[in-house]
């Protein structure tokens, strides 16, 4: 993925779910997904499409699926090799908070000059707390429609 403008990353609900015993809540029983919540938001597709139509290169990387399918997949090594101007994470549902914020910290470690965006319902609602307590997050795209703000 050399030289893209934006990489949208979908993290598992818990970054190191393969190493730590975790007690998943009842929400994972009603969502058509594993407790890792590997389905990325449909908004990723519309954002990438919109950006591409406006001359930008954008990609989606589903880290959760990569980690589920391959027990030896090294997410940090993969992230280190990414080449993007900007990175974005979804934080729609609160079960994604730990995974998204932990993986954003890994991105910031290897790409300290690249801005990291966060979007989604929970990110919008808790935007002040996130910006105050999680320095790896540079911007939060609030609300439902993020295509136009991405161009700004």
Stretches with model-predicted labels:
Residues 2-4, 85:
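Nucleotide donor/acceptor-binding cores
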Residues 43, 47-50, 54, 59-152:
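Glycine-rich beta-alpha loop elements in corrinoid/cobalamin-binding modules
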Residues 36-37, 93:
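A generic secondary-structure micro-motif detector
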